[in-house]
């Protein structure tokens, strides 16, 4: 999912809406394809190296927030990152620190008064566990996030990535909403059951009423701001609910979103029904 700093919105009167990308735009498709290629080219590389490559690609682009959002989705949904080391990094550090303690003080370059330098400590620690100094260096801090290696990457198509991005924008809007009102029209009962199951599974506080004619429903969901005062966990559950709504054929969604710029006025209303046109391939 996208964090709030990556959310792009537009304001029209008292309404605030996500700024969806045009999934048919060649510019956006080229950007998505370029990012996918960067990830694919950095197999077995450290996360820090991959992030540096992404930063170089971003440069002075005015759409850097879109790139960062797309990259986050690739990291979260399509990458497997893990610790790659010949021994657990914690054990390697214990061995290195034990050797360094015996020779304290250890210097970077030996001199007349200090004969043991860092490279000697690393080499001796490696000998104690059958590893070379280079292997010890590689694994010593392999558990830091920036040193996690890209173990596998399952690339989406540029179209799928852009579609997923639009869904993520809508989800990010729900992190800080006060209330969501969903109207669903006539549909297969199985889809309605799936939607209500998602509401219950995510433990969302809600009320349900039937629409006139008995073919549709109106669902009012309490948002994370209404009761929990920006509870991140509840906000995430609210966002996770959205893809289940997208399975329905006829629906509308509006959310009341408090805005710091409108503290003395009414809350803004976020409208989300248009997202269905651009995200069909993601669900």
Please give the residue ranges for each predicted region.
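Nuclease-adjacent, charged terminal/linker segments that flank catalytic cores
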Residues: 1-278
């Amino acid at each position: 999912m996208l964090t709030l700093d990556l959310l792009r919105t537009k304001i029209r009167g008292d309404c605030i809406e996500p700024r969806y990308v045009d999934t048919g735009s060649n510019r956006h498709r080229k950007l998505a394809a370029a990012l996918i290629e960067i990830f694919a080219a950095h197999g077995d590389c450290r996360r820090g190296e991959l992030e540096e490559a992404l930063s170089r690609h971003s440069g002075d682009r005015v759409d850097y927030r879109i790139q960062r959002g797309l990259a986050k989705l690739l990291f979260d949904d399509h990458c497997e990152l893990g610790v790659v080391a010949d021994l657990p990094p914690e054990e390697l550090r214990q061995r290195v620190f034990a050797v360094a303690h015996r020779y304290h003080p250890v210097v970077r370059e030996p001199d007349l008064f200090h004969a043991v330098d860092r490279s000697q400590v690393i080499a001796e620690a490696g000998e104690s566990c059958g590893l070379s100094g280079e292997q010890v260096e590689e694994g010593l801090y392999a558990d830091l996030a920036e040193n996690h290696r890209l173990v596998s990457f399952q690339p989406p198509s540029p179209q799928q990535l852009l579609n997923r991005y639009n869904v993520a924008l809508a989800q990010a809007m729900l992190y800080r909403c006060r209330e969501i009102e969903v109207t669903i029209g006539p549909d297969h009962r199985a889809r309605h059951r799936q939607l209500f199951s998602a509401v219950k599974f995510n433990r969302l506080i809600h009320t349900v009423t039937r629409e006139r004619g008995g073919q549709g429903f109106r669902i009012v969901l309490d948002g994370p701001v209404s009761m929990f005062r920006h509870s991140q966990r509840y906000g995430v559950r609210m966002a996770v609910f959205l893809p289940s709504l997208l399975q329905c054929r006829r629906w509308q969604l509006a959310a009341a979103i408090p805005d710091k710029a409108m503290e003395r006025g009414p809350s803004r209303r976020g409208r989300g029904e248009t997202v269905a046109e651009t995200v069909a391939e993601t669900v």
